[in-house]
From Swiss-Prot:
Phylogenetic lineage: Eukaryota, Viridiplantae, Streptophyta, Embryophyta, Tracheophyta
HAMAP family for this protein: RuBisCO_L_type1 (MF_01338)
Cofactor binding annotation: Binds 1 Mg(2+) ion per subunit.
Protein family per UniProt: Belongs to the RuBisCO large chain family. Type I subfamily.
Designated name of the protein: Ribulose bisphosphate carboxylase large chain
Places the protein is found: Plastid, Chloroplast
Class of enzymatic activity (EC top level): lyase
Known function: RuBisCO catalyzes two reactions: the carboxylation of D-ribulose 1,5-bisphosphate, the primary event in carbon dioxide fixation, as well as the oxidative fragmentation of the pentose substrate in the photorespiration process. Both reactions occur simultaneously and in competition at the same active site.
GO molecular function terms attached to this record: magnesium ion binding; monooxygenase activity; ribulose-bisphosphate carboxylase activity
Organism of derivation: Morus rubra
Post-translational modification, as annotated: The disulfide bond which can form in the large chain dimeric partners within the hexadecamer appears to be associated with oxidative stress and protein turnover.
Catalytic site positions: 165, 284
Binding positions for substrate per the UniProt entry: 113, 163, 167, 285, 317, 369
GO biological process: photorespiration; reductive pentose-phosphate cycle
Length: 465
């Protein structure tokens, strides 16, 4: 067969509706919005080509390899209900296209180049199916849910956290004081804000020292294990590791990383260190909305969540369903289960396009944070269940009597909700009543109930843009 130069339609090579997907293929579901006049098969095939072996013209060197073995294939196209010019293109990628144990390489291939493609008006990666064979090349979360509970000796309830505010401007000593008060009042964790790294007003080493002091003092006084998410995110991987090593030397239980701004390579490096050295790893998703907020373009958060479980993290922020940050309930619960469970069935009503088996990767605790307070506690306990971290920043520090009473109020509200649930009461129906009853014997909770009695963050869903 002679080499035939020139441009030919992608669909001749990359649209293969007869293809039987293999157990080892990575499968992707893309929401494609083609330019007017571009047929769906051509657009779907273009996505498969540009994210695997294709380029814009036939090249002589195609003859030196086996395209059949290495090409991505668009194997199915389905229209999106209620959208005229949109459809879901399913693409299968042979496993050999990807480096083992590298989320970075997986994303560079699948979403690296194709999103700027001229034939498409918009493109969104809705979901990925990661095959068992590929998952087994990743360490995943440093410890996972069960090991974390055993380390902390805390069972049968969600864990409570609090982000220290104001996030920027406190000195290290005042910051440590706020940490101590929250932990002393009854929280399990406090947290560095995602943009607290090492700024002129508070260098990282000073903060680490004062926070460690706060942890040990509050542990001694409460008899409970406490933690503070020390943010190790830095400008270079070496500096990040230096901070993680210092945290380990202080003997604290947990560090933190901003995995999207820090990058997957840095994150996976840190996750490996955390497992080797017994540190838990809390993950913040700063920058996620840049990628996942638009309905037609970018990447859905469930893909970023799957990537994090592969790269490694023990906690990750996952929206609230009830607070100030958006999240539709079923969709949010879909990716919360993707983070926690070993096996998740395909369920389009929850946005899950593929059945996903996590083999033996540990689970990640979802963190609910953002505009939540004591009145939300019954809903949060009901929606997220025991395996979660409920994080109240303003909902702790905004208490009229101060940080420690704010922490007390949250802990009392949580214990009341868990107790009521265990007695068989319906939190969705009786939630407000349960909180009111508990506030009768907790003045701290009563004061919190009074401050936030009618606050609701209710706006139309943003996904309609």
């Amino acid at each position: 067969v002679g080499f035939k130069a020139g441009v030919k339609d992608y669909k001749l090579t990359y649209y293969t509706p007869e293809y039987e997907v293999k157990d080892t293929d990575i499968l992707a579901a893309f929401r494609v919005t083609p330019q007017p006049g571009v047929p769906p098969e051509e657009a779907g095939a273009a996505v498969a080509a540009e994210s695997s072996t294709g380029t814009w013209t036939t090249v002589w060197t195609d003859g030196l390899t086996s395209l059949d073995r290495y090409k991505g294939r668009c194997y199915n196209i389905e229209p999106v209900a209620g959208e005229e010019s949109q459809f879901i293109a399913y693409v299968a990628y042979p496993l050999d296209l990807f480096e083992e144990g590298s989320v970075t390489n997986m994303f560079t291939s699948i979403v690296g180049n194709v999103f700027g493609f001229k034939a498409l008006r918009a493109l969104r990666l809705e979901d990925l199916r990661i095959p068992n064979a590929y998952i087994k090349t990743f360490q995943g979360p440093p410890h996972g849910i069960q090991v974390e509970r055993d380390k902390l000796n805390k069972y049968g309830r969600p864990l409570l956290g609090c982000t220290i505010k104001p996030k920027l401007g406190l000195s290290a000593k005042n910051y440590g004081r706020a940490v101590y008060e929250c932990l002393r009042g009854g929280l399990d964790f406090t947290k560095d804000d995602e943009n607290v790294n090492s700024q002129p007003f508070m260098r990282w080493r000073d903060r680490f020292l004062f926070c460690a002091e706060a942890i040990y003092k509050s542990q001694a006084e409460t008899g409970e294990i406490k933690g503070h998410y020390l943010n190790a995110t830095a400008g270079t991987c070496e500096e990040m590791m230096k901070r993680a090593v210092f945290a380990r030397e202080l003997g604290v239980p947990i560090v933190m990383h901003d995995y999207l701004t820090g990058g997957f390579t840095a994150n996976t490096t840190l996750a490996h260190y955390c497992r080797d050295n017994g540190l838990l790893l809390h993950i913040h998703r700063a920058m996620h909305a840049v990628i996942d907020r638009q309905k037609n373009h970018g990447m859905h958060f469930r893909v970023l969540a799957k990537a994090l479980r592969m790269s490694g993290g023990d906690h990750i922020h996952a929206g609230t369903v009830v607070g100030k940050l958006e999240g539709e309930r079923e969709i949010t619960l879909g990716f919360v289960d993707l983070l926690r469970d070993d096996f998740i069935e395909k369920d389009r009503s929850r946005g899950i396009y593929f059945t996903q088996d996590w083999v033996s990767l540990p689970g990640v605790l979802p963190v609910a944070s953002g505009g939540i307070h004591v009145w939300h506690m019954p809903a949060l306990t009901e929606i997220f269940g025991d395996d979660s971290v409920l994080q109240f920043g303003g909902g702790t520090l905004g208490h009229p009597w101060g940080n420690a009473p704010g922490a007390v109020a949250n802990r009392v509200a949580l214990e009341a909700c868990v107790k009521a649930r265990n007695e068989g009461r319906d939190l969705a129906v009786e939630g407000n009543e349960i909180i009111r009853e508990a506030s009768k014997w907790s003045p701290e909770l009563a004061a919190a109930c009074e401050v936030w009695k009618e606050i609701k963050f209710e706006f139309e869903a943003m996904d309609t843009l």
